Structures are given as C-alpha cells and as structure tokens.
Curated annotation (Swiss-Prot):
It catalyses: a ubiquinone + n Na(+)(in) + NADH + H(+) = a ubiquinol + n Na(+)(out) + NAD(+). Its main location: membrane. It comes from Haemophilus influenzae (strain PittEE). Belongs to the NqrDE/RnfAE family. Composed of six subunits; NqrA, NqrB, NqrC, NqrD, NqrE and NqrF. GO terms for molecular function: oxidoreductase activity, acting on NAD(P)H, quinone or similar compound as acceptor. It is found in: Cell inner membrane. One of its GO terms (cellular component) is Gram-negative-bacterium-type cell wall. This is Na(+)-translocating NADH-quinone reductase subunit E. The gene is nqrE. InterPro entries: NqrDE/RnfAE, NqrDE/RnfAE_oxidrdctase, NqrE. NQR complex catalyzes the reduction of ubiquinone-1 to ubiquinol by two successive reactions, coupled with the transport of Na(+) ions from the cytoplasm to the periplasm. NqrA to NqrE are probably involved in the second step, the conversion of ubisemiquinone to ubiquinol.
Length: 198
C-alpha cells in the first residue's frame, strides 16, 4: 500500500505532467482563463488519463509486448497507433457524455475538448507507463495521479490568472507574457518536491 501512495504522490507533485515535464501546454495555457472551465477540463483530462493508462497497460501487456501473444512475436511497433486509438476513443465517449449531461461545460471547453485526444500529457502518461513497466494496479494509480496533478496545476494557474485581472501589470507583459512567468514560477515551486525521496 505504501508503494502505491508513494507512486500517487510522485505522479501528482514530483513528476507533475504540466509543471515538471511541460506536457499538455496547448490546452494548459489556453483554458486557464477561468477556474470553472479549468476545473472542468482538469476533470476531463483526469478521467481520460485515469482510464487510458490502465487500458493501454492491459493492451500492451497482453497483446503488444514481446512474447505476449505468441512466443517470439513482438508487436510493440504498434504501440503508438494503438495508444492513440484508445485515447481518441475515450475522448469521443467523454465528449458525448459531456454534450448530453453537461452542455454548459461542453460549450465552454469548445474546441479544446476534442484536442484532449492529441494532448501530449495523456500520451506522455501512457508512454511513461510503458517505459517504467508499471503493472495494472500501478498504472491505475499513476493514471489518476497524473491527471490530478495536471488538474491541480491548471486550476492553480486559472486562479492566478483571475487574480491578475485586477493587478497592475505592465502593458508589455499582459496576456501570455505574465502567464509564462507565472507558469515558470509555479514550475520552480514544484521543483522543490523533486528532492523528496519516497
């Protein structure tokens, strides 16, 4: 149990997808204007990561990995296309559910919802799972932890952005300039977790 808690804390704080690896920056910067929208996208990314990583782990371990199906057969060259297909399918399901049950969030996310399918944070989570050879329970913990870490980062940035609307920011830094500075400072803060040994 201690191993899984350690893996979860590592995924959320120490190896944060957005602030340690800078993955998923397109949607991270574009949807961080309002906390409510950022929270909705964070939930969506957490859902997709939390399901895509374990599902892809099962497919990789039982089908694609060397000697998984037949002795001497290695289908790992199909990793990318398989992982992307699973992620795209999950995003389509999520899009249909949000359109049916949460139309306001669906409309607020707009074009960025389908872009989750090509969000490099999600593909990065799946790739790290393969690279680190996580088993199924570890992949569940890692997937949800990575998603929650990304959500924590985007909600924190959205909160800062909302506060900065009322701040006296120099004209040259308004918009993306101050956002990049804020993200850099947040990343420095998250770097302090890198010295923690779990």
């Amino acid at each position: 149990m201690e191993h899984y808690i350690s893996l979860f804390v590592k995924a959320v704080f120490i190896e944060n997808m957005a602030l340690s690896f800078f993955l998923g920056m397109c949607t991270f910067l574009a949807v961080s204007k309002k906390v409510s929208t950022a929270f909705g996208l964070g939930i969506a990314v957490t859902f997709v990561l939390g399901i895509a990583v374990p599902v892809n782990q099962l497919i990789y371990a039982n089908v694609l990995k060397e000697n998984a199906l037949i002795e001497g057969v290695d289908l790992s060259f199909l990793n990318f296309i398989t992982f992307i297909g699973v992620i795209a399918g999950l995003v389509q399901i999520l899009e249909m559910v949000l359109d049916k049950f949460m139309p306001s969030l669906y409309n607020a996310l707009g074009i960025f919802l389908p872009l989750i399918a090509v969000n490099c944070a999600i593909f990065g989570g799946v790739s790290f799972m393969v690279q680190r050879d996580y088993n199924f329970p570890e992949s569940i913990v890692y997937g949800f932890g990575s998603g929650l870490g990304w959500m924590l980062a985007i909600v924190a940035l959205a909160g800062l952005t909302e506060k900065m609307k009322y701040a006296d920011i120099p004209a040259g830094l308004k918009g993306l300039g101050i956002t990049f500075i804020s993200v850099g400072l947040m990343a420095l803060g998250f770097m302090s977790f890198s010295g923690i040994q779990l």
